[in-house]
Amino acid sequence: VKGKESDDETSSPVMKSMNITANTTKPLTATSVDAANTYDRYEKKNITVRFSGVAQGFTKLTSIEYKFVPKGVNNKTIAYKTGSSYTVKNGNCGRFYVRYNTPLGSTEIKLPGFTVDTKAPTSVKIKANKSGIKTLSTSAKNTYSKRIKKSVKFTFSANYGTSGKSMTQYKFVPRGKKASKYKWKTANSVTYKTRNKKVRLYVRYIDKSGNITTKKTNGFYVTKK
């Protein structure tokens, strides 16, 4: 994967350039270590961050150190390690600090925090307030034998993993129709009241990193009584 490179927004009297390359969706632009911590970035693949730099002509770069600090942890409690890259894997949320060392002094920078969530939502459920409605794989055979009186309310739930919930979307698809022909609507629940029309319900669960799990119900129809 081709990485994205970003020169930092900080300056250093001993460093000519301090570069960060990462396979993130957006470049990681460096800030001062005193800048507020941010965690509004979400990635759905493991992220490898690479550090490089060039010292000013009157000195030399002796080493590059880094540390990945989990969200909520004081960076002073984590020790620096020497190296030029580090991979953040699934289930982690945190920020990088990078230190460039020369005989004339060191320069320390911080990168924006981000979350790595490579897993699609799990424990997904389509709950109905009437019995006989099942949560199924989208590849399951469609059946339409379930009869429901008056109306049925569906609520959607899932475990969204490290990144958390972005949204749930749904669509009702009539018997004999392709699901791809119908548009998604965003909601956490929906009530179906249309009479004597055989349909199935599709629901997709989306986390903040963009991972998606899609399920459907067995087919059903609503009668007056």
Language-model region placement:
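Low-complexity, disordered linker/stalk regions enriched in Pro/Thr/Ser/Gly
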Residues: 1-225
